[in-house]
Amino acid sequence: MTDRSKLSHFRRVFGRGDLGQCSNGQKGSVVIESLANSPAILALVVTPSTVIGSYFVFSLVLAVGLVTIFLRGDWQKARGLDKLILFGPLFYAAPLAGFGTEHFTLTVAIASIVPKWIPWHLFWAYFVGACFIAAGFSLVTKIQVRLSASLLALTFFLFVVLMDVPVWAHNPRDRFGLTFVLRELSFSGGPLALAASLTKPGRERAKNVFATIARYFVAIPVLFYSFEQFLHADHVPGVPLEPLTPAYIYGHAIWSYLAAVVYAVGGVLLLVGKKTRAAAAWVGLSVLLVELFVYVPIAVVERASLDNGFNYLGDTLMFCGTVLLLAGAMPREE
């Protein structure tokens, strides 16, 4: 059914007086009609099931993560920026699980982007989607988290090598193509940093090597995004992609310039290996502010759209999570 026909169907089913009969049939009809015309109900009815599914799984992982943080006492023990760093796994995991849901609701579309030379496209679409959802719950519950983080780092690195770089190579002048490449690279760096921080004692060399690789995987995208946001402040900030910042966003271009400045300072510190924990935390905070003041309003306005609503909200929150995952893996004192 189309959105309009779904709404008509809803009113036909729930707008009958006999469903709302109390002591007065007409009064029941008025109550039901008012309910059917309420903004919340109308928004739910006209929102496609694909969008609802992604938001549901996203919210479920978010809720589990929040409960875990507070029940384990992590929030009470953390101080200063460490309180923000606590949310790194949560901010990464919730969008990841939401994107995993799309592999089940948009299977054919997801399968179509798998390289032609790889067999069983539908299988990989389902398999990766299931893994993303499972990994999301793993990150927030800390069950087999090192395994999940390691596999996520490998998965996103393979995405970069097998899909993103070949696409960008067809048109190297496409700055958005490079933006996608570096975004996926950072999505590999975050969980790689987490896995490195969980390396068993006695393997300090391996831990330092992987943590350094993860730092570069995040620092390079942060610096490139800083440059892009200075040049194209009229485009959406955080992860600077093609859409222009909507006119209804309060402050408009100021969010791009704010993020660009913080990214520039934080990115340089991450690249040279100085004050890395604080640098990553401050970059993460700037992304979170962009998420709250830019992408949450966009998601509300575009609540019926995956492409223009949930996906941009999720991408930016996941980027925030990946930077905070890096922060959590960096030394406390330098």
Q: Language-model segments: which ranges?
A:
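Short, Lys/Arg-enriched N-terminal segments with co-localized hydrophobic residues
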Residues: C22-V30
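Residue-level detector of alpha-helix boundary/anchor positions
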Residues: R12-D18, R175, D307
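Conformational-control "hinges and anchors"
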Residues: G136, G267
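Membrane-interface interhelical connector segments
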Residues: T105-W117, F230-H252
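Short hydrophobic transmembrane-like helices used for membrane targeting/insertion
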Residues: M1, V13, V30-I32
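Extended, low-polarity transmembrane helix blocks
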Residues: V31-T105, W124-C131, T141-D234, Y250-V265, ...
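Short hydrophobic targeting helices and cationic amphipathic motifs
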Residues: R4, F10-R11, L19, S23
